[in-house]
Amino acid sequence: MSTLAVVGAGPKGIAIAAKARALAAAGLPAPRVVLVDRGEVAGNWTGRQGYTSGLLPLGTPPEKDIGYPYAPSWGDASAGVVAAMAEYSWQRHLIMHGAYSDWVDRGRMRPTHRQWSLYLREVAAAAGAEIVRGAATSLDIGDGGRWEVRLETGDMIVADGVVITGAGPSVTVPGQPRDHPMVQDGRTYWLAAHELRRDRALTVCVVGSGETAASVVIDLVKHCHKHSTIDVLTARGVLYSRGESYEENRLYSDPGEWPRLAESHRREFLERTDRGVFSLQAEAVLNQARGFRTLAGRAAEIEAREHDVILTIAYGDERQRVAYDAVVVAIGYDARWFEGLLGENAGVRYRAALGDGELARVIDVDLSVSGLVPPLHLPVMAGLAQGPGFPNLSCLGLLSDRILRRYVADNKARALTAKRSEHA
């Protein structure tokens, strides 16, 4: 049996573990799936590790759960796999808690992040997910050609494939201090928000134009002193919103036609629907807010002083230094953080597979880096090449199908070889 190591015990990791359990229940030779995480299961959704207060609404409909879109992807075994995955559905979770009819009658409200984390933890437990505690400190390829995942605990997991999930560290601005109460990022803001919810008016600048920034801005609008001033710094000086339509949503759920689109059109689609846009719900809140404005430019430098924070704003050839009481840098997370974990052998093979190309362009159908053996699966980088739903929560069931298929095929081939050897 092959082993698949997943760095991160969040939605993607849990979806893969649950699907492996469903495949095994349907009689398919699923791999052993090991989830590696330094914190608790679904910890980034609880509010205890930053990234959210835990009370923010889920950005996607909860029906797009661990098994969505429940596609018949496994031939004759498909019905059994889909039925097994239905046991891990959001609706099943509500039914077991006696909350299904209430949820329907209230208009299928989106759960909070904390409620979503409880669902994820229940799925992980029900699926019997194997979870190893500890941070991954090194990913290298051993003499046997398999991955060696080393942990801070000193343990090592040997695996036939590795999946990288979860947000990387926050992207920073030059001069941004690591530990200053009035300079925060998209993760730490939620751990220090009380510093900005004071009884006096503050001037705050939020740097960013995506959903991370939107969540921070809405929280500030709701909880800061009513006379506070909140600036949002974006490259274009305008907050664009994303409307939803069947045609857009279809490509998130079923990206079969996605690779056939011209790359320029795929990039435009991602720009319009997934990157640098506020949701309509966020825009509705901000449309009613006072003391809120947008500025054009980029954050060129931060200077944190004792009583204020100086933000240098660059726009074209102009540079302006503006003093704020606080600055929140919410420009996203480093999706390529895993590169710092790659050991010598893995680094050489990874760079050879990448060549002079852009990483986002060389992600294969199974969400791995094309040409890299053993496979390294990077769903967060798969949006451009394979479909817009893979980096987020829009098609977790399809994501797990894509990744697990090669390991099921490998296990079948090994079993067939072993059987032939017995009869030789």
Segments predicted by a language model, with ranges:
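Flavin (primarily FAD) cofactor-binding/catalytic cores of flavoenzymes
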Residues: M1-E40, W45, D102-E211, S215-A424
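Conserved N-terminal glycine-rich FAD pyrophosphate-binding loop of Rossmann-like flavoproteins
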Residues: G39-A79, L239-G256
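Amphipathic alpha-helical interaction segments
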Residues: S53, V82, M96-G98, A124-E130
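A conserved beta-strand/loop capping segment in the N-terminal third of enzymes
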Residues: Y68-W103, M109
